Amino acid sequence: RPLWHGGWEKPLTFILLAVISGAAFLLANHVGNSNRSPHPQKVDRELALVLLFGVIFFAVIESFRLWEAWSSSWSTVSGQAWKTIVSGPYWYVFWIGQVGLLMVLPVFSILLGLQRTDSRWLGISGLSVLVGVFASRLNFIIPGLVEPAFSKLDLAYQHPRLSVQYFPSLTEWTITIGLGAIIILAYLVIQRLLNHGNWMHVDGKKV
């Protein structure tokens, strides 16, 4: 699967997305669980800056990969996969999910939140990035599967089970949503048991 292989940018993208999603979760969680004024505190600003630079760096890497595929006129197998991503049947996952929610909206909401000193905009950026990261992983998995490993491979066998066309089934969506709900529930229970809000302090102040 050529789309799944690459040079230095591939492992860097995985590490960067892990940092981005972690910062986004912490930022959204901290803003959402803080019973205080909407003015961001030091921890909010630090997480927001980490998220901002991470998103910009990720956007630069993805732009380079897209330019690389476009400059080859989509002629390589990896280029064909990129063409499927940007203009295929699920183009909205890339343009709305990955570009809009992962790259554009977080940058503007973070800058707006820091300028207006309103942590609610920072919380929105965290939630937006979490959804965008999910869309980014869909763009990594599905196009890599639907593009044949070499030309005419999809014509060698004619059977529904051997088709390269793929989209998650209802069962797969249900399992994913169910596991996500269990993880969120476990987190909320642990947070309540540890009485998180009474012991987390930054600079000697309760946050």
How should these model regions be labeled?
Residues 1-125, 132-135:
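Long, contiguous internal "core" modules enriched in hydrophobic/ aromatic residues
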Residues 80-85, 148-171:
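Short, membrane-exposed interhelical loops at transmembrane-helix boundaries
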Residues 115-119, 149, 181:
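Catalytic-face loop-and-helix region of soluble metabolic enzyme cores
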Residues 122-127, 173-177:
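Hydrophobic alpha-helical transmembrane segments
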Residues 135, 191-194:
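Membrane-proximal termini and loops of membrane proteins
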Residues 135-155:
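Juxtamembrane non-transmembrane "cap" segments at the membrane-aqueous interface
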Residues 159-191:
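A generic transmembrane alpha-helix motif of multi-pass inner-membrane proteins
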Residues 197-207:
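Short, highly charged, low-complexity non-transmembrane loops/tails of multi-pass membrane proteins
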